[in-house]
């Protein structure tokens, strides 16, 4: 016998399906089903994953595309796609049902179902009286494409339900097909299905009642079992339906938008015209012969693969941004393209890096190139709305991002479903160190009190493992647009995003890549926003017009690089993390390409591939540089014989092992997926044999393969690093020459980067920039620059810093502020008329100029007499109550209301109060000997744990003289977990290490001192 499963829901039927689509097709193929239909509820979100699994494993099973719907909560149907027209119809129905409802739900109308002309309809009677009405209604509209689908789950009413369905089939002269109503690939997933149902109903599994599946019969079942449950003719009908379904997802063909081509041009001639025009702009001194040849090669390949429209689409988008004054920068593999450089998509001169066009486009890949373009994060919405306006909502939508269960959400949801107390779950979540790779979370939770021998404890661990990675809902991609020539909803369903004026498709970037469909990445980058704002401030206060291009055209500035070499890079793009800062004094960047290397080398890939130490030794002249051949030298000479970039690995495979460009790109993809599936192993024989055949010794070949494995999924492309290095240098240059403008721009672009406003302000003050507190008479919503008596510019903090105080209230306050300023809080109250806003400003001490202190301001805010019209214009003298806030109280309130304080540092106050032992301040560390024992204390402002094999965590402690870099090894973290994970004020006893002017402390003992400053509302940026 044979069978086709026609009704099967994956975990993209959120909180219902208990298996991945991949698991379902693998299990169905194992059972030798003829076909399987992935039919999630009003969704095709799981179908591409099933398709990709069948293709990858070459499974002998047919996939049918479909979806299940409820109409009026009474009529349940499954729509299947026998042909391409049926698929377009299904996508339209899903789109309509989703678009007329809130995100996460759908509303199917009778018209939607009546309009079906091509889809097959499986009707699943509900065993209610209304079945007779819906049977008649469906038979009237879909007589020749309608089946009664019978599910048998071996429940108590199975026989009665089957008889009911047979009577309905006879009544309406409809054929019957067997189907399973499958929710899981194996019976072992039943407990997880119960948990999902409990999460859906907001209760524990014990309280589900009749909502809980009574058995595991909604798993895929072997054929011999199905033959005992269903009549043979019903099973045969399932395969008959499957035979009629000829549509395959591989039939989908992407059609590029065509309206960008002016009259008189072909796509080829128009692209060439734009490139010719652009290369004169990019190379005003003349086109080098090798660049000219590269352009011709690229254009020929673009024409051969018919990617003209893709490049023209990206060019159109970036030209819109340029015309609107929106900063942008193309990055990633696009920087390997000289055509992209000529089209002004990317900013990296191809002569500055080693261009590898195969990284961008190759014949063997048979897929469109991937161009990432970053725009200012505050103005990206203008670009997004331009795309919607140009192509219409019918033809453009954002790709989806699948939001999945991760450790915290998995622990919380599974625990609640099993009836574990929320306080215990919070304790688990807070105290498990997920970055400890040598001790899994299971062992840590057992140490924290979970009973592993209990049934509930065993279920908890099993179910958390199973649900981790399950999709929770679809969100919008950070900027991946899909733009089509015709209606997009005929290619993939479109639904509402949570954000207003946004729509998303039901597929993510991996799905699009699997089907070789175009995605245009319109991404947001905070640093571009900060740079533009800095340019504006420089022009306003210094009448100097700057641009990224102008700064990068300047010769490498030794003053800027000296600042970088000292790791004075707080706020500088890409080189501000503790991992980067620890590397800067060792690598000592002195030119642009050094920055390219710096950005890439402080990554897990080069570290795990053991490439960092050899590179540094060779750079410092401590190790000779040698190459086994001229071909290898041509690839590795720029990085002193050590592979640092992805492109170098790809080129090595080509020149040393004989890989074609496409084969080398397949190697790159395998590297990207190395941690998931270990597919790199299949390349080892070809790589080793290819090198041996070309005269390289086995040791060299093995070392190259080991380095490739070390890169794993962390390899960093040179093209990516080159694009980032432009912004890194630009931001460092601005920090050195225009510090007040730089910090103001950064503060006005928050949230972004590694550092909080408090840390940025502390760094600004250390660089001699005066910072003024929020003031009712001098602040605007944004932070701005003011001329100080010493002739220098200072930063006036803005109302945006006050937690809970909105821009509308701030704007009203500034617009109506008298030229001489407010004279009394009562004037402000008449403008804001919102006691909460007044209290927020009082808490932030914004009224100090009027009231003397925040206590007086609060009294004035609570004074109801002055709210009466008769007393509006009475100017009372500044109150001088005896109760004055202490310096400590002011500090606590500063942090609570604005997240920072301009008064004395918490560490200073704690020391004066006698709450701290003797310790060494950051500024005193330079006086200490290398390898000496020190004790440091500071407020924890950051914990960073790069994905390196060493298991290091970099702590940043802030004392009253600066930031202290602390290195915590895995063993130390594990032995002192509480202080490691939760402390706000931390004492560290350890060994001082110094490299030039840069110091860090290797932690030995961690002591939590938070109790000394328990009320402090400081926040650290942890593990980002």
Swiss-Prot record:
Function field: DNA polymerase involved in damage-induced mutagenesis and translesion synthesis (TLS). It is not the major replicative DNA polymerase.
Lineage: superkingdom: Bacteria
GO CC annotation: cytoplasm
Family membership noted in the UniProt record: Belongs to the DNA polymerase type-C family. DnaE2 subfamily.
Catalytic reaction list: DNA(n) + a 2'-deoxyribonucleoside 5'-triphosphate = DNA(n+1) + diphosphate
Protein name stated in the entry: Error-prone DNA polymerase
Keyword Nucleotide-binding listed: no
Source organism: Vibrio campbellii (strain ATCC BAA-1116)
GO biological-process terms attached to the record: DNA repair; DNA replication
The enzyme's E.C. designation: 2.7.7.7
């Amino acid at each position: 016998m044979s069978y086709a499963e026609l009704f099967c829901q994956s975990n993209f039927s959120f909180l219902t399906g208990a298996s991945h689509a991949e698991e379902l097709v693998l299990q169905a193929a194992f059972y030798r089903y003829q076909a399987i239909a992935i039919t999630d509820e009003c969704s095709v979100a799981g179908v591409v994953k099933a398709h990709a699994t069948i293709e990858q494993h070459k499974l002998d099973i047919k996939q049918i595309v479909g979806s299940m719907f409820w109409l009026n909560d009474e009529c349940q149907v499954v729509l299947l796609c026998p042909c391409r027209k049926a698929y377009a119809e299904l996508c339209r129905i899903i789109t309509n049902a989703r678009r007329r409802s809130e995100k996460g739900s759908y509303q199917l109308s009778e018209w939607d179902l009546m309009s079906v002309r091509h889809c097959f309809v499986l009707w699943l009677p509900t065993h209610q009286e209304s079945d007779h009405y819906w049977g008649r209604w469906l038979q009237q509209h879909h007589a020749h494409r309608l089946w009664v689908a019978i599910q048998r789950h071996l429940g108590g009413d199975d026989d009665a339900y089957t008889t009911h369905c047979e009577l309905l089939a006879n009544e309406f002269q409809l054929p019957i097909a067997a189907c399973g109503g499958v929710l899981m690939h194996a019976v072992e997933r039943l407990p997880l299905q119960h948990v999902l149902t409990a999460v859906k109903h907001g209760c524990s599994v014990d309280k589900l009642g009749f909502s809980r599946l009574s058995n595991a019969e909604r798993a895929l079942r072997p054929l011999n079992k199905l033959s005992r449950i269903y009549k043979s003719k019903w099973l045969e009908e399932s395969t008959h339906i499957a035979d009629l379904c000829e549509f395959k997802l591989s039939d989908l063909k992407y059609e590029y938008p065509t309206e960008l081509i002016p009259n008189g041009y072909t796509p080829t001639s128009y692209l060439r015209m734009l490139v010719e025009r652009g290369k004169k702009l990019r190379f005003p001194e003349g086109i080098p012969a090798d660049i000219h040849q590269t352009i011709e090669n690229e254009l020929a390949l673009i024409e051969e693969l018919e990617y003209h429209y893709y490049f023209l689409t990206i060019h159109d988008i970036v030209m819109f941004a340029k015309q609107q004054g929106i900063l942008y920068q193309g990055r990633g593999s696009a920087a390997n393209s000289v055509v992209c450089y000529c089209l002004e998509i990317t900013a990296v001169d191809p002569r500055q890096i080693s261009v590898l066009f195969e990284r961008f486009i190759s014949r063997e890949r048979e897929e469109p190139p991937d161009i990432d373009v970053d725009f200012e994060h505050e103005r990206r919405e203008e670009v997004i709305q331009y795309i919607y306006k140009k192509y219409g909502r019918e033809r453009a939508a954002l790709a989806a991002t699948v939001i999945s269960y991760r450790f915290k959400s998995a622990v919380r949801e599974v625990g609640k479903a099993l009836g574990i107390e929320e306080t215990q779950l919070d304790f688990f979540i807070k105290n498990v160190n997920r970055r400890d790779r040598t001790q899994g979370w299971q062992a840590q939770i057992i140490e924290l009190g979970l009973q592993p021998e209990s049934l509930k404890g065993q279920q908890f661990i099993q179910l958390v493992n199973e649900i981790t990675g399950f999709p929770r809902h679809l969100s919008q991609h950070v900027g991946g647009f899909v733009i089509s020539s015709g209606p997009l909803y005929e290619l993939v369903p479109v639904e509402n995003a949570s954000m207003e004026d946004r729509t998303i498709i039901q597929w993510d970037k991996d799905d699009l890549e699997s089907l070789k469909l175009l995605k245009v990445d319109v991404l947001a980058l905070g640093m571009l926003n900060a740079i533009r704002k800095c340019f504006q401030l420089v022009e306003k206060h210094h009448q100097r017009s700057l641009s990224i291009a102008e700064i990068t055209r300047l010769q490498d500035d030794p003053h800027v690089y000296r600042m970088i070499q000292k790791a004075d890079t707080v706020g500088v793009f890409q080189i501000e993390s503790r991992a980067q800062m620890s590397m800067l004094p060792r690598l000592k960047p002195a030119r642009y390409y050094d920055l390219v290397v710096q950005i890439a080398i402080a990554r897990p890939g080069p570290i795990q591939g053991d490439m960092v130490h050899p590179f540094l030794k060779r750079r410092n002249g401590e190790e000779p540089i040698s190459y086994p051949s001229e071909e290898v030298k041509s690839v590795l000479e720029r990085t002193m014989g050590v592979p640092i970039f992805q492109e170098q690995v790809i080129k090595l495979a080509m020149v040393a092992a004989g890989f074609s460009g496409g084969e080398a790109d397949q190697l790159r993809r395998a590297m990207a997926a190395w941690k998931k599936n270990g597919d790199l192993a299949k390349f080892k024989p070809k790589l080793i044999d290819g090198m041996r055949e070309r005269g390289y010794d086995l040791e060299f070949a093995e070392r190259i393969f080991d380095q490739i494995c070390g890169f794993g999924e962390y390899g960093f492309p040179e093209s990516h690093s080159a694009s980032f290095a432009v912004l890194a240098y630009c931001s460092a240059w601005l920090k050195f020459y225009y510090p007040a403008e730089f910090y103001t721009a950064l503060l006005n672009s928050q949230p972004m980067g590694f550092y909080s406003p408090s840390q940025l302000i502390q760094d600004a003050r250390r660089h001699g920039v005066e910072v003024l507190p929020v003031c009712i008479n001098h602040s605007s919503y944004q932070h701005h620059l003011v001329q100080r008596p010493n002739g220098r510019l200072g930063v006036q903090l803005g109302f945006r810093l006050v937690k809970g105080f909105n821009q509308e209230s701030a704007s009203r306050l500034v617009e109506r502020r008298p030229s001489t300023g407010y004279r009394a809080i009562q004037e402000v109250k008449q403008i804001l008329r919102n006691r909460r806003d007044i209290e927020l400003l009082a808490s932030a001490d914004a009224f100090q100029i009027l009231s003397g202190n925040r206590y007086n301001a609060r009294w004035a805010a609570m004074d109801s007499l002055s709210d009466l019209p008769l007393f509006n214009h009475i100017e009372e003298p500044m109150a001088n109550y005896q109760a004055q806030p202490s310096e400590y109280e002011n500090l606590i309130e500063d942090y609570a209301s604005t997240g920072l304080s301009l008064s004395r540092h918490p560490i200073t106050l704690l020391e004066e109060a006698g709450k701290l032992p003797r310790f060494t301040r950051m500024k005193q560390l330079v006086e200490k000997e290398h390898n000496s024992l020190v004790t440091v204390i500071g407020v924890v402002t950051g914990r960073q744990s790069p994905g390196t094999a060493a298991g290091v965590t970099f702590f940043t402690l802030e004392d009253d003289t600066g930031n202290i870099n602390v290195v915590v090894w895995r063993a130390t973290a594990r032995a002192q977990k509480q202080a490691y994970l939760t402390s706000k004020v931390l004492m560290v006893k350890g060994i001082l290490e110094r490299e030039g002017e840069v110091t860090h402390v290797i932690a030995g003992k961690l002591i939590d001192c938070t109790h000394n400053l328990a009320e402090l509302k400081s926040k650290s940026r942890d593990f980002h």
